[in-house]
């Protein structure tokens, strides 16, 4: 009651904001007479003037009134369109990083030119995001005339563009493109092997057209780049034939070619084993024995395959670790004994086991990179959006994206008549009424737009209209070019257009048809008389349609979201035109059935209601809207729930991508490698010779074997300790560290500093990328089963955060170990070899991308809704939480032993 009273006195927040913006509109209007007097050259000179003022530190908000006035005058001169006052308000809302709700026909495309022009003056790039390629190209071509006239460059990005053209488009002041293309290019940039391979120059400011469609409707499913793994199935088979000839050692120092670390599930080749394996691989034709060895740089893939094959033969046993069923290797869960259908071991192990068992070696499709639109667009420093329907989702925009919705008043009052819903007993009665309404409108020359929720319904209606002899168009949303043409002509007298609810957005339905399209069809050589004749003919049609009642909207079913229904209604009544709308429903429709439609249907039949009888009451409409609100709230919970999970992945993605950027930008990564090497060697030594331990606790032979197998170092630590009995654990660690550093220094001296720097950078990038891809697969597996923790009285989200952090920490440690191991063992003779290696890697990366699938779909073959429902169901089973361990205070020492406070270490994930 108090809120209502305050609103009546001071106005709503929306009204207060509009009052503030109207004051700035008055300033812009006051500048108009002065700006109008400027010559074209003087007006164009304003752009470099503004740029200089901004470069000198003047805020954009200070430049805004003058910049908007210049853009408005340029629009009048170049496009023949002058921005209305309400369009100036819309432009300011977009500049402020908010969402402008503007009704259909209010000129959103023209509105965007104001904030785009102003923000492009900073020189950091502005992205204008549309829902399809056709609209991106159309808007870039139309509005590009204005921007180019004002001295700004415009680019448009679309799938399949040449690399140089796309880089140029992103380097422009203003770049148009679809949400998918901006997202995929962001992912591609974070798979690039050099700075020159990247497209984008940072995510600075974006204006999202149809923002509700992109940030809400498409928010639940991620963009995924997936492709076949690099491994060749043939190479697995060839290497598999070599492994049976290698002999297993009974002990670490025994005779043979390799020994097995049962606990770590690893296999290590001895020095003799390396020579024997190299000989066998040469005999098999896999290696060229005259010019290359097993650990030559170009043979790292062969080493990877050999290790996988050794593990498959020596560690993984049939009918224990896996079974063979229907020609496939199926993993057996070591704890439950159940088969894990659909799961595959990573790192090439599964293919190696398939080769061992003689079943077809499958080439995996691996997720190379993924991101959700929620996380993509939240990375922009400033984000804004436009749509005709955002107010119903204002809470979600605010809570997830921090975007406030401002409803912009229409330039002219809306006079469209929205009739109450008509509810029928069943679908047959409903569609009979729909067909009768369409035929009646067609007879009196009133255009009709029929909105359906499925292609099946569209085709059924089309069939009935054809039988009745009613001419009509069915809009296929897959053909964007044709879609725009059909929608542009949907306002002609008597036109009947059947479309799915979302089709045709971005193109206005003009009463009488599109005059602009007709004039364009005349061609550039058309005379003034021809143009005048076309305009006169259009004017007659325009008046005829207005007299018939304007565009009539027929909705054949209520959508789950009120916003989608409002979008359909909003196609009619643009710019103060007449229009009407009505929804026809049946108690069998999905929305009504879920909320008790079947029960009501039985009751109505008992009361004698017939098929052709209709319920028409405002109360019914309100009840339906109440049902829609319930569904909207449920869908919001799903999206919010999924975002909580995605945020964990996103935090990790940011760390990895930041590390990649640092590597790509760095001239040298020597300091990074030196630091990593020290950490890795310290950890390796500590495993066999623990700090502050006595010599009885040392495993010097194990340390020697590991240094030899992993780092190619031969050190007789046993003899060293015998000679120097005073050596303690710290001294041994120092000796090993000294020897490793000497080994790296010798390698650098033999190949040259420049070659070594290039190799270090290449190895770090390659290992990081490969580890990240494998980590994504592990995260997918974790996520698919995490909801089951709810049945064990644990919170799935907290469990996911905890285990994801552990997986990520393990991955980072493995990256360090792998980098040092590869750099220790790789043999490089010249700079040309490194360049050849980088060229081969780049070629492989390009091949991966060319074979990749660019998807906007659900991950893992199950829907996002199902996953969220499973999580929610599991969480409902969570009773009062019982801790497995005592609670750790935020200022207590972290139990991991790092010495840091819990809040600064693992507590950061809480």
Curated annotation (Swiss-Prot):
What the entry lists under InterPro entries is as follows: Helicase_ATP-bd (IPR014001), Helicase_C-like (IPR001650), P-loop_NTPase (IPR027417), SEC_C_motif (IPR004027), SecA (IPR000185), SecA_CS (IPR020937), SecA_DEAD (IPR011115), SecA_motor_DEAD (IPR014018)
- Return the Low complexity bias intervals: 869-880
Residues noted as binding Zn(2+) in the record, renumbered to the chain: 894, 896, 905-906
Q: Give binding positions for ATP.
A: 87, 105-109, 508
Point out the signal peptide segment: none
- Enzyme Commission code: 7.4.2.8
The record's Gene Ontology cellular component field reads: cell envelope Sec protein transport complex; cytosol; plasma membrane
UniProt-annotated stretches for the region Disordered: 848-910
Localization, per the record, is: Cell inner membrane; Cytoplasm
Q: Which GO terms describe its biological process?
A: intracellular protein transmembrane transport; protein import; protein targeting; protein transport by the Sec complex
For this UniProt record, the keywords arranged alphabetically read as follows: ATP-binding, Cell inner membrane, Cell membrane, Cytoplasm, Membrane, Metal-binding, Nucleotide-binding, Protein transport, Translocase, Translocation, Transport, Zinc
Q: How does it sit in the membrane?
A: Peripheral membrane protein
Keyword check for RNA-binding, yes or no. Answer: no
The record, for CDD domains, names: DEXDc_SecA, SF2_C_secA
Entry's cofactor comment: May bind 1 zinc ion per subunit.
Under catalytic activity, the entry for this protein gives:
ATP + H2O + cellular proteinSide 1 = ADP + phosphate + cellular proteinSide 2
Compositional bias ranges of the Basic residues kind: 900-910
Cofactor(s) needed: Zn(2+)
Indicate the principal place this protein occupies in or around the cell. membrane
| Subunit annotation | Monomer and homodimer. Part of the essential Sec protein translocation apparatus which comprises SecA, SecYEG and auxiliary proteins SecDF-YajC and YidC.
Q: Enumerate the PANTHER family for this protein.
A: CHLOROPLAST PROTEIN-TRANSPORTING ATPASE, SECA INNER MEMBRANE COMPONENT OF SEC PROTEIN SECRETION SYSTEM
Name the family the entry cites. Belongs to the SecA family.
Q: Which HAMAP family match?
A: SecA (MF_01382)
Q: What is this protein called?
A: Protein translocase subunit SecA
What organism, scientifically named, is this protein from? Answer: Stenotrophomonas maltophilia (strain K279a)
Which lineage ranks, top first, belong to the organism behind this chain?
Bacteria, Pseudomonadati, Pseudomonadota, Gammaproteobacteria, Lysobacterales
